[in-house]
């Protein structure tokens, strides 16, 4: 039977998050219902409230970085049992489409419906207000909800000793930031790297660049404590402006500039991208 619990949702945009009582459906085939233990807070969640990121269904439950414990499993659903610890991925991976089959699960066909708020294969949701109104789930998850019924395509089982309050961040900020340096940026040993914006994603980009062996990691952020944190995480330099970073990079590369430039600014504008090529 459905579970009554609380969520934090936006009724329209621009708007504010508010607490609401919701009904969470039983899981169907290839779905699980999870008791949320921890959720991250991503800048994308704020973009939902401001309207910078439009969505297809209002009200809309926020949150896409989360981890919890499986409370129930849908019929004929394989790979999960009640009590399993899971971490959510904001990008689903079906394992069947062309992209998943060729090792590019970040491009899974299911990702096209991330912000619709509904299921991948029909216009319904698994979350409703008490009057029956459908509530959209961010990335098909909605980790700001105490319980969430989600497709198994969005859940990864993790070891029993996993600390979920830490692991919840793996679903977006770690994968996005680390991946921007290691996978997309393809940072190599000895490279000079500039990273603009040291929030959750930028901080992980710093760590990814350091792990990949970059000789010089230049973090750019106007906020002092973020620059300090970047250096704690391995950045060799931390400056306030892209102009400063560019001059430092040129000094290491005989005037050529950075080998890799990563933009992880919360609200990215064309000039930020242009500066990355300077």
What role is predicted for each listed range?
Residues 256-262:
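Short SAM/SAH-binding signature in class I
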Residues 25-39, 52-101, 106, 114, ...:
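Glycine-rich beta-strand-centered segment in the early N-terminal region that forms part
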Residues 43-50:
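Cytochrome P450 core scaffold surrounding the K-helix E-X-X-R motif
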Residues 23-24, 57-63, 136-140, 146-147:
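Short Gly/Pro-enriched turn/cap motifs at secondary-structure boundaries
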Residues 90-153:
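Cysteine-cluster motifs in flexible loop/terminal segments that predominantly coordinate metals
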């Amino acid at each position: 039977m459905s579970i009554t619990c609380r969520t934090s949702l936006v009724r329209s945009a621009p708007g504010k998050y508010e607490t609401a009582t919701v009904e969470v459906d039983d899981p169907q085939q290839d779905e699980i219902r999870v008791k949320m233990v921890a959720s991250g807070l991503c800048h994308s969640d704020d973009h939902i409230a401001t309207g910078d990121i439009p969505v297809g269904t209002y009200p809309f439950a926020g949150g896409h970085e989360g981890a919890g414990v499986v409370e129930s499993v849908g019929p004929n659903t394989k790979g999960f049992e009640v009590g399993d610890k899971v971490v959510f991925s904001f990008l689903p991976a079906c394992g069947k489409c062309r992209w998943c089959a060729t090792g590019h699960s970040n491009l899974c066909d299911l990702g096209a419906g991330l912000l619709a708020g509904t299921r991948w294969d029909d216009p319904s949701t698994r979350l409703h207000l008490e009057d029956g109104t459908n509530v959209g789930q961010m990335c098909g998850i909605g980790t700001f909800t105490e319980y969430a019924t989600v497709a198994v395509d969005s859940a990864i089982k993790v070891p029993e000793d996993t600390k979920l309050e830490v692991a919840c961040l793996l679903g977006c900020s770690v994968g996005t930031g680390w991946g921007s340096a290691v996978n997309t940026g393809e940072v190599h040993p000895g490279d000079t790297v500039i990273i603009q914006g040291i929030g959750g994603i930028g901080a992980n980009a710093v760590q990814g660049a350091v792990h990949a062996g970059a000789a010089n990691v230049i973090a750019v952020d106007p906020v002092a404590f973020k620059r300090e944190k970047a250096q704690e995480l391995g950045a060799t330099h931390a400056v306030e402006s892209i102009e400063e970073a560019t001059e430092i990079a040129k000094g290491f590369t005989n005037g050529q500039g950075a080998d890799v430039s990563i933009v992880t600014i919360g609200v990215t504008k064309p000039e930020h991208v242009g500066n990355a090529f300077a």
